[in-house]
Amino acid sequence: MITFLSVASKKEENDLMRESVREQAALRTDERWKFHMFEKISEAENFLEEVPLLDIISWDVTMKKSVPSLERIRRDYRQSYLMVVADGSISPMVYLRPGIMPSSLLLKPVSRENLVMVVNEMMDAFTEKFDNKDVPESFVIESREGKQYIPLNQIYYIEAREKKIFIRTKQEEY
């Protein structure tokens, strides 16, 4: 399962993002996708308190207090693919730095054509990494449902019981 988190200033942008990512995901992977879409930073932060597994993050840095929030979140999700959504009013010096380290950039106003192009590039890079068996600092579970990458720093413990192996993170057991 691949988990996607989006924080956008408008619901329309989130809807367009989900649609574009779904289209590209259907073409490129057989994995199940889980989407978490937010228009408020506070809601996203509340969701992230549980430290869920996230593979891809899209974050709008034009929203108030979004950059400091993104820096805090990025500490826990260094290995997640990060797409920053920005506009001309924000200097690239704000979001192009080691504390944030975005993987791609989408400029506002978000048009369907630009979004499709950026999502296409993102999916190329992400699926290349996902198909690569050697993902550093991650535990890989392959099953009939697909691959699940669990960052080692999010694993609480691994337990063998009932002739199966269980991996426990803060929020889930696999």
Annotate the PLM regions.
Residues 6, 35-37, 105:
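Conserved beta-strand scaffold positions in the cores of enzyme catalytic domains, especially
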Residues 22-28, 172:
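Short helix-loop-beta junction
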Residues 29-33, 43-130:
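CheY-like receiver
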Residues 11, 39-45:
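Acidic phosphotransfer microenvironment of two-component signaling modules
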Residues 2-21, 57:
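Conserved acidic segment of CheY-like receiver
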Residues 120-174:
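Conserved binding/recognition cores within well-folded domains
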Residues 34-40, 138:
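Extended hydrophobic secondary-structure segments that form protein cores and membrane-embedded regions
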